[in-house]
Amino acid sequence: HFGSFVYKKNNKNKKMIRIFITCFIALSLGVNAHADIKGSTLNKISEKVSSTVSNLIPGEGLTEVDISIRDDNEGNPEVQFDILGVRDLIDNENSNVFTQFSLHSQDVNGDKRAIGNIGLGYRELNADQSMMIGGNIFYDVDLFEQHQRLSMGLEARAAIIDFNYNYYQEISNNQIVDGFNEKVLSGQEYNLSSQLPYMPWTTFNIQGYRFENEKAAQDTKGNIYSLEMALTPSLAFDVENDVSSVDGQDDMWNYRLTFTHPPRTNKATLMDGLTSDVAFVKANMQDKLKDKVRRNNNLVVEIQGAVTITKK
């Protein structure tokens, strides 16, 4: 038992070391890209793409297009595309009622799916505008196979740190797809995020998640560590590592480019400089009223057969 404990501990330490090395490499790439960004080459390209993005969804508000690559460390990368919009319904200086919606691709058991999400949210600032609290509800659906899910979320966000919690509840029956029984799982997650010290153009996020399996021996659980980097007002690059707590489950890596419209002129980017004189730059809380909700738009699906696996 002691030997097993030591092995698991060493394995966990190796995972953490790899996470820090990857974040260091990502930041180093940011340093190397800084000269190019200052020369405005990347900025001009991202602004051009951003203006094109603005035409995809009508109305005023945040519009994002993501291109991401998921790597399972076994040479099976998955490319996913996502378009997301946030639109105000009733807003003023201290509160906001809004809708958020997205359409994206997801690979489930080698099969490309189209996943739709639509939600309604409410956010409010406290009296001195130092904190924002909010709640939201979402409906998620696999447009091809009719898997369905509801979620409820809570947010508490301050000038230098954000927290949110999401609970997901499946509402559809099992579906037979290509001879396999598929089941959407219920579960929950939390997110805690803040900027790296003296780098206001970065955000480091820790997510803990757990989804209740139906037939698999263990629930799907783990932690996701992500580094989000705002390169220009219109372009961000994210690196995340999904560290599973399930025995025998490999880590997943995700690399994402996000084009945003309108450009985030009120948020620090790498264009403003690699470092700041202030350790933590306080964010404008009114701007956070119009941010997207941080949640998992992918469905977590258990594929039941001779061997039961889970895709998320």
Residues of each region from the PLM?
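Bacterial N-terminal signal peptides
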Residues: 21-28
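N-terminal secretory signal peptides that target proteins for export/translocation
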Residues: 1-15
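Transmembrane beta-strands of outer-membrane beta-barrel pores
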Residues: 69-73, 103-109, 122-124, 139-143, ...
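Flexible, glycine-rich linker and terminal segments associated
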Residues: 35-58, 171-205, 211-217, 230-238, ...
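Outer membrane beta-barrel translocator domains of Type V secretion systems
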Residues: 37-125, 130-142
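Residues on the lipid-exposed face of transmembrane beta-strands in outer-membrane beta-barrel proteins
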Residues: 83-87, 118-122, 137, 152-158, ...
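Residues that define the transmembrane beta-barrel architecture of outer-membrane proteins
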Residues: 61, 75-83, 95, 112-118, ...
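Repeated loop/turn-to-beta-strand initiation elements of outer-membrane beta-barrel proteins
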Residues: 60-63, 91-99, 125-135, 160-165, ...
